[in-house]
Amino acid sequence: MTLRESTPPADLTTVLHAACAQTGLDPAGARLIHHYANAVFLLPKEDAVARITSARHADTARTGLAVTRWLTDVVGYPATGPLPDLDPIDVHDATVTFWTYYAQHGRPRPDSTYLGAVVRQLHDLPHPPVELSRWRPLHSLHAAVADPAQSRALSDQERSWLLTRIEQVQDDLADLDYPLGWGPIHADAWAGNLLWDDTAPAPRVVLGDWDSVCWGPREVDLIPSWHAAVRYGKGPQWARAFADSYGYDLAAWRGFDTLFAMRDLVQIAGPLRQAPYNQTFDRSLKQRIAGVQADDRNPWVEF
């Protein structure tokens, strides 16, 4: 797993060491390798990673852990695997889970063809023996934007406009008929959540980051690849390769534009959290809001 590295805040290090003390894992040499919605630490002594989630999202962390245990241990689905026999640890207003570390050895990241295959496989599975929440599109984003403490990077005008737009897209989503039906969905199925797994008898690609797993319309897991083709400059061939691998052309469905608008809004959530502390994220937030307001199909520049 090769992700953005940074210097961890002192409170995250405290949480990590407290959780490791409860599990008997060795945090020596721990390194923060990702800090976005969650903080992810590499534990080199254990060949594992620790994911630190805010306590307010403890239920989703527990659900993701239970689902991936079923996927990996029972049905043999290619998901990132949690460390065996370790329950989530609640400590210092956070929840910590522990996972297998997948070293990427400088390989190219798996592309949309791999993603289409693993999403198709997921959508063909039965309901897991885990209670899944029902998909609530843009619910957490609406709450964050409505809370001045969480959205202080926004002007009052931006906040008001975004709340109206979120509610409009939510209404549009509720009016759609979903031809692929409802079932267990990943709900953030983009290629950045794919990793090479060399722990299996033969190298394979696994799907990670199961914090958003829920019961919802399967089309939700398809839109990220079309969105990446446009907003992140992957190009039409990226979406076509996904469609060929999955076996369905989402762009031919009448609800495509509504789902694209939803994904645009979803992508505001990440920089919204980080913008008050980081100018790069603030520029990214402003760019994305401008694109949503223009309702255009222009690529977003990575700052």
PLM-predicted stretches and their roles:
Residues 33-45, 49-50, 82, 170-222:
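Active-site acidic catalytic loop and adjacent metal/ATP-binding pocket
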Residues 9, 13, 51-93, 103-124:
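A conserved alpha-helical element in kinase catalytic cores
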Residues 1-27:
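Juxta-kinase regulatory segment immediately upstream of eukaryotic protein kinase catalytic domains
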Residues 218-250, 262-279:
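Active-site activation/catalytic loop segments of kinase-like enzymes and analogous catalytic loops
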Residues 94-108, 143-153, 264-279:
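A glycine-centered beta->alpha junction motif in the catalytic cores
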Residues 251-259:
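All-alpha amphipathic helical-bundle segments outside canonical DNA-binding/catalytic cores
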Residues 3-4, 148-154, 237, 269-303:
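ATP/Mg2+ or Mg2+-diphosphate-binding catalytic cores
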Residues 106-160, 180-182:
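A cross-family kinase active-site recognition segment
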